[in-house]
């Protein structure tokens, strides 16, 4: 039950279209919320998510640390998103804290800057999307984290007149914000950076 990475490979290969992941997550949810039986390592992860807003318990203010390593300006959105900012770049936990993922974060930010795209980041206002909690069966914690982020998004886009467009590099953030949050009544136009993504002359993302 706990060895599954919820990658979806089994679902893609299943000849009768069984939704294995949904069943596995439901069983984990029962184990966590009803039986309180789960791997001890998850206890630390749950506490870190609850207290620090990331799986490792890192300082929330350190989400901005990668910006100091850039030789170009990066706008940190402190209040509502200005109309001139076209894209919100959602960095994510790994993109802010993990050294290898930070390289991707800086590369994407540089790509946006060099392409003349006006973008901004939330910095310390970000918190984990809740994907690790939901996948591990802690639906209660997921609801807390997701509502916090949805409230932040609503504040950011409170007076914004354009499309609500968000760039992400993390596939987990892409799925959670783009699909799971939509189930909670909140919808954004998601753009996932990948090798096949190109910027055309009007700065729109096409795959």
Which residues make up each language-model segment?
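Iron-sulfur-cluster electron-transfer modules
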Residues: 1-176, 180-185, 190
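Single conserved hydrophobic/aromatic residue that forms the stacking wall/gate
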Residues: 195, 199-206
């Amino acid at each position: 039950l706990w060895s599954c990475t919820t990658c979806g490979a089994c679902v893609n290969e299943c000849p009768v279209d069984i939704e294995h992941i949904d069943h596995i997550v439901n069983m984990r949810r029962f184990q966590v919320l009803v039986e309180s039986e789960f791997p001890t390592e998850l206890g630390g992860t749950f506490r870190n998510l609850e207290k620090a807003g990331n799986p490792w318990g890192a300082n929330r203010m350190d989400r901005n640390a990668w910006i100091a390593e850039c030789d170009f300006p990066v706008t940190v959105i402190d209040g509502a998103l200005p109309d001139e900012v076209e894209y919100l770049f959602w960095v994510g936990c790994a993109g802010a804290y993990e050294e290898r993922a930070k390289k991707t974060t800086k590369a994407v930010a540089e790509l946006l800057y060099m392409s003349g795209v006006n973008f901004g980041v939330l910095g310390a206002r970000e918190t984990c999307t809740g994907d690790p909690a939901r996948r591990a069966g802690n639906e209660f914690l997921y609801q807390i984290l997701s509502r916090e982020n949805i409230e932040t998004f609503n504040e950011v886009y409170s007076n914004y007149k354009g499309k609500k467009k968000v760039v992400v590099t993390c596939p987990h953030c892409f799925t959670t914000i783009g699909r799971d949050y939509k189930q909670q009544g909140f919808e954004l136009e998601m753009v996932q950076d990948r090798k096949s993504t190109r910027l055309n002359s009007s700065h729109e993302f096409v795959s």
